[in-house]
Amino acid sequence: MNDKIKKEWFVYMIRCMDNSLYTGITTDVKRRYEEHEKGRGAKYTKVRKPIKICTVFQVEDRSSAGKLEYFIKNLSKKEKEILISDEKNKKNFINYAEEKLKIKIN
């Protein structure tokens, strides 16, 4: 019998001190953000210190997280800013991304 517990995966966007947006994936957003704050996260956030989490998406598995992360990272800065600007835009993005990527975003 397989008793593996299915991990939740998250895609998160962080605002950095230089006003840029960093996108990453994790199973624990709080822990990962703390790593970024302490300079133990990605090279990107070591240089561009994180100041806040802008948004978080929950997905079903690692594969879905990777697909969504890649998709977001390929958006323009303007598109990313629109995405995080309000809940309506986020919901519209979720609907579009679910259809385009064939994944479920919670």
Can you annotate each of these PLM segments?
Residues 1-38, 49, 53-56, 66-67, ...:
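GIY-YIG nuclease catalytic motif and its immediate N-terminal context
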Residues 41:
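Flexible, gly/pro- and Lys/Arg-enriched active-site loops
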Residues 70-85:
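Short arginine-rich
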